[in-house]
Design a protein with these regions (language model features):
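Glycine-rich phosphate-binding loops of nucleotide-dependent enzymes
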Residues: 2-255
Length: 255
């Protein structure tokens, strides 16, 4: 499989602290990769590098054959990278439908004059967006909540809605930042099935940061391990589980 995303010695420093050090990471088209490590290992920082929240102080990041150097987050999203966050970031007072529609509007082809004029093209585009929003909501069993405020959904459904919003950006690569956080055992099982379904249904690559090792080991084809910003392992789940460096990093924790 060819590489969709490549980090080549990607490094970021904050003052005298090196948060991520010379990270080499590749994700192939259609691959599901886990990124794990103890608290403070640099996982979310790596996500922020990939999505343009931070700019690397060294190395480079290449996506779909083109450098992401100095790209703003919204441009990176338009290029095909979408993400979720550790803390759910929905519009709580907007309906489920409008939360997803807002993302589709980022890709609206018409300019401001086109929208103000509200001609046939505008209305056709709006109807197309509404249809696509409902298609996504139905796929993820959220259609029945279309007119419900996002804040009224259960925690698990809010997580699901956040993932739907990310998919509305039509990404080639989906970054999931601790999607199982705060979920009970039943919700985690459902999440695992959902992530595998997304990969198969939408034929996209997924990079998953997650502390729950059962989730990671159960669905990831390959796992990359960070410790203090340094990559200490990269391999199949069974290889990573048996790696002495990984065992030492997770000393006292269940693998």
């Amino acid at each position: 499989m060819s590489a969709l995303l490549q980090l080549r010695k990607a490094t970021i420093r904050f003052g005298g602290l090196t948060a991520v050090s010379e990270l080499d990471l590749q994700i192939a088209h259609g691959e599901l990769v886990g990124l794990i490590g103890p608290n403070g290992a640099g996982k979310t920082t790596a996500f922020n590098l990939i999505t343009g929240v931070y700019q690397p102080t060294g190395g480079e990041i290449v996506f779909d054959g083109k450098s992401l150097a100095r790209s703003k987050p919204y441009r990176i999203t338009a290029r095909g990278i979408a993400r979720t966050f550790q803390n759910i970031r929905l519009f709580p007072s907007l309906t489920v439908f409008d939360n997803v529609r807002a993302v589709f509007h980022l890709h609206l082809r018409g300019d401001v004059r086109h929208a103000l004029w509200r001609g046939k093209g505008y209305h056709a585009e709006e109807q197309s967006i509404a249809d696509r929003v409902m298609d996504l909501l139905e796929i993820f069993q959220l259609g029945k909540f279309r007119d419900e405020a996002a804040k009224n959904l259960s925690y698990g459904d809010q997580r699901r809605l956040e993932i739907v919003r990310a998919l509305a950006a039509r990404p080639k690569l989906l970054l999931l930042d601790e999607p199982a956080a705060g979920m009970n055992a039943t919700e985690k099982v459902e999440l695992t099935r959902l992530i595998q379904f997304i990969k198969d249904k939408f034929q996209i690559s997924i990079l998953l940061v997650e502390h729950d090792m059962k989730v990671v080991m159960g669905i990831c084809e390959r796992i990359v391990v960070l410790d203090y910003g340094i990559k200490i392992a990269d391999g199949k789940p069974d290889e990573v589980r048996a790696n002495p460096k990984v065992i030492a990093a997770y000393l006292g924790q269940e693998m």
